[in-house]
């Protein structure tokens, strides 16, 4: 088993605002949470789903997927991961792969794992990928990343850095989007849970990594390949059907 000191946790809730029940949504014959777990297991790391809903627990148990239920109210997936981690998990660090990533790239996860194993313990690790589609740059459901010297400076749903002036193609040289893979040590998660409220910019943008920034925790950004789709809306779910069939045909 790879990276015995770490564990992949997959937070999943049923009551998603933009796509209720999406963790159990069917994607070409498999639920989204099952597909996400199977992608994570391609890394050969230990992985477990963390949820607040018995329906998701039942789905996991049906397919022999390790699962933990967190009954406390959690404002974000990272809060849910933190609740699970505080139960004395016997690992040094945790990778969070969000439950709506049915096409998560296992090589990306392993790149984050390598950084966790060999990087600076003071840093949270996060992923980003180059934006290649102009629609993604202007899409407010996709967080855009501002980083230099390998560290996150800001992340926003707005199209940033904004290509001011006549040359709107400038985004091609500087546009990066969030990849929803995170790495934390336990002390990061304990700090994240303090106060039990969202930070100011986290609340405005609805992007949880901003809480770490506002606490003064450095966030190391790794350039990753990324996945073809993060499922957040009904339209995304429709696209996912086609992508899943392509993936399944290759296996």
Regions found by a protein language model. Name each.
Residues 2-3, 172-251:
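Conserved alpha/beta core of the MobA/IspD/sugar-nucleotide pyrophosphorylase nucleotidyltransferase superfamily
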């Amino acid at each position: 088993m790879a990276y015995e000191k770490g564990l992949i946790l997959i937070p999943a809730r049923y009551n998603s605002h933009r796509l209720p029940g999406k963790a159990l949504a069917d994607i070409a014959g498999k639920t989204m949470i099952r597909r996400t777990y199977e992608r994570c297991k391609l890394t050969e790391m230990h992985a477990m789903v963390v949820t607040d809903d018995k329906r998701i627990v039942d789905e996991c148990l049906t397919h022999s997927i390790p699962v933990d239920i967190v009954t406390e109210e959690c404002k974000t997936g990272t809060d849910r991961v933190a609740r699970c981690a505080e139960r004395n998990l016997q690992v040094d660090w945790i990778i969070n792969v969000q439950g709506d990533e049915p096409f998560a790239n296992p090589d990306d996860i392993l790149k984050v794992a390598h950084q966790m194993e060999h990087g600076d313990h003071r840093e949270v690790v996060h992923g980003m990928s180059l934006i290649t589609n102009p629609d993604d740059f202007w899409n407010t459901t996709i967080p855009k990343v501002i980083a230099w010297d390998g560290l996150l400076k800001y992340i926003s749903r707005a199209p940033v850095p904004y290509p001011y002036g006549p040359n709107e193609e400038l985004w091609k040289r500087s546009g990066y989007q969030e990849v929803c893979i995170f790495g934390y040590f336990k002390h990061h998660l304990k700090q994240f849970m303090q106060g039990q409220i969202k930070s100011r910019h986290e609340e405005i943008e609805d992007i949880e990594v901003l809480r770490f920034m506002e606490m003064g925790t450095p966030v190391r950004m790794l350039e990753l390949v990324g996945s073809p789709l993060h499922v957040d809306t009904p339209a995304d779910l429709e696209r996912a059907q086609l992508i899943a069939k392509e993936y399944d045909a290759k296996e």
